[in-house]
Amino acid sequence: MRRSSRPGSASSSRKHTPNFFSENSSMSITSEDSKGLRSAEPGPGEPEGRRARGPSCGEPALSAGVPGGTTWAGSSQQKPAPRSHNWQTACGAATVRGGASEPTGSPVVSEEPLDLLPTLDLRQEMPPPRVFKSFLSLLFQGLSVLLSLAGDVLVSMYREVCSIRFLFTAVSLLSLFLSAFWLGLLYLVSPLENEPKEMLTLSEYHERVRSQGQQLQQLQAELDKLHKEVSTVRAANSERVAKLVFQRLNEDFVRKPDYALSSVGASIDLQKTSHDYADRNTAYFWNRFSFWNYARPPTVILEPHVFPGNCWAFEGDQGQVVIQLPGRVQLSDITLQHPPPSVEHTGGANSAPRDFAVFGLQVYDETEVSLGKFTFDVEKSEIQTFHLQNDPPAAFPKVKIQILSNWGHPRFTCLYRVRAHGVRTSEGAEGSAQGPH
């Protein structure tokens, strides 16, 4: 601000502008070149730290302030009014500190007023320098680096802990396996300790193997010998065994002589025997009722060979057959044989005889003597023997078997084998062996 000149002073009425600058800035406020003011910038050869002068050698720029004092521009503090000076003397003699002397007659600011400039206050109100910001950024960067390093250390420590756990688990499993293996060895070694301590040499081992091989060869030779002996015995006894088998088959466990065999002289009286069953369709007859492709004669009942279909069939469920015995026989039993239902091709035994009667016949007068009535049960054994009612015993040259019914077949009845048991008498005793009339 402009200040009025003091009375009696020859100061110019020019406008004064104070030159304030910061230590961080090399530029200062300059005066107006149009008014002939001197620039506040340091001249050539002038030190940089030289303080700026006012526009004239008069007073520094002041502003109206509180009464009784003056206020420096740019400062909020109130300063007392300076003491009066001889401006000419001061301007002629005073020089700026650290600079060249001014020409005579130009006002120069003394050091004492310069000390009164509010330089310190201006510096305190300046914004913080950029160095502080750089320091903060460096501090934050350092903290971030430290945090990243700490995180890496923690991750590495976690990995180490995991690897240590894995190693501990592996070592535990390995120790358990070794313990089990050791216990197994102890269990196996303990029986071996009870064996003889002496170990066999290789030659002794070969000798034992050789001796055992010889023993095996001897056993094989004995087995071959026994096999040959058994074969010889079988060959020698084959005929005997066959005879025994056929004998048992012929006897059929009856163990009684059979006088109704064609091989001992028995025959069929065809005149007194029923007619054979004649079927027009022999193929149907064979396939359905398991017969041969032709009708069997009644002599088949005198043969020892009994198998399904090898029988004598007569028409209907009633018929008779008369057997001529090889001599006079005191009859005691009659045996009938019929295959069981399980082996019949027709799946049943309904053609078997059921109720029948036995008669003894004399040769001369053809007198019939009843020897009893009986029933053949197909559910029982296939061979059934019936005891005759011949008391007192009488000898007969013929015997008649009369079939009264069968087991349900509507067209025919089959008779397989008939046996006559008793005692054969001599010709001299023929007259005394007469049965009742």
Swiss-Prot record:
Signal peptide range: none
Tissue expr: Predominantly epressed in testis. Expressed in ejaculated spermatozoa (at protein level).
Pfam families attached to this UniProt entry: Sad1_UNC (PF07738)
Keyword hit for RNA-binding: no
Stretches that traverse the bilayer: 135-155, 166-186
BP terms from Gene Ontology: cell differentiation; spermatogenesis
Chief location of this protein within or outside the cell: membrane
Composition skew (Polar residues), residue ranges: 19-31, 72-88
Membrane topology: Multi-pass membrane protein
Biased composition (Low complexity): 1-12
Gene Ontology CC annotation, any one: motile cilium
Region Disordered, residue ranges: 1-88
GO MF annotations in UniProt: protein-membrane adaptor activity; structural molecule activity
Domain spans labelled SUN: 265-425
Coiled coil: 197-244
Keywords, ordered alphabetically: Cell projection, Cilium, Coiled coil, Cytoplasm, Cytoskeleton, Differentiation, Flagellum, Membrane, Nucleus, Spermatogenesis, Transmembrane, Transmembrane helix
UniProt keyword Membrane, yes or no: yes
Function per UniProt: Involved in spermatogenesis. Required for sperm head formation but not required to establish and maintain general polarity of the sperm head. Required for anchoring and organization of the manchette. Required for targeting of SUN3 and probably SYNE1 through a probable SUN1:SYNE3 LINC complex to the nuclear envelope and involved in accurate posterior sperm head localization of the complex. May anchor SUN3 the nuclear envelope. Involved in maintenance of the nuclear envelope integrity. May assist the organization and assembly of outer dense fibers (ODFs), a specific structure of the sperm tail.
PANTHER family xrefs: SAD1/UNC-84-LIKE PROTEIN-RELATED (PTHR12911), SPERM-ASSOCIATED ANTIGEN 4 PROTEIN (PTHR12911:SF16)
Oligomer status and interactors: Homodimer. Interacts with ODF1. May associate with microtubules. Interacts with SUN3 and SYNE1; suggesting the formation of a spermatogenesis-specific LINC complex; a SUN domain-based heterotrimer with SUN3 may associate with SYNE1. Interacts with SEPT12 and LMNB1; during spermatogenesis.
Protein name: Sperm-associated antigen 4 protein
